[in-house]
Amino acid sequence: AGLLRIVPPETIIGLADDDMYYYPNWFKASVDLMRSYPNVGQVSGWPVRTQMRWGNNFTIKWARKYAVYEEGKFIPEQWDRDFCTSIGREWDFHVHYTKNDMDKRITYQGIPAYAVAHHCQFVCKAGNLVEILRQNNEAMSDDKVLDNAVDGAGFLRLTTVERYVRHIGNVLDDELKPKRKRHA
């Protein structure tokens, strides 16, 4: 948090776990989304359905008032399968575990986003993160604590509808192995 206090508040920073894979244009897509919505606290580049269980109450409340809000199964099955592979979860268990979960998608001024961000990877304005840490000095101590702190501070948490980032769980699967050289 000390470094955040010396950079200008409008500086866009990125935080991520070390086992993330980035597709081309991930940063631009995230920043473009951030600039398309008001009062954004976080933008992630990969939607995960189970993440939509917490930390998005403010975003959903805002969306119902100012945007188009939809619930459904919008995330492609393959992305769900990739998520399962990255965390070592069996597909059949995941299908059962998430059977009642719905994706929460919003559209504001023609720009779609998911109503969630992921603590494993996000971009934000440095000043917003400083404000969140002022309100909750334990926000960086746990993933859900951060997610809920951003939500509780009244910031939108968004994810691109296209997958620009992917959790790889420190293992490259057969699809990602050939890409490691191309994007290095």
What are the language-model segments listed below?
Residues 78, 86, 91-184:
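C-terminal catalytic/acceptor-binding lobe
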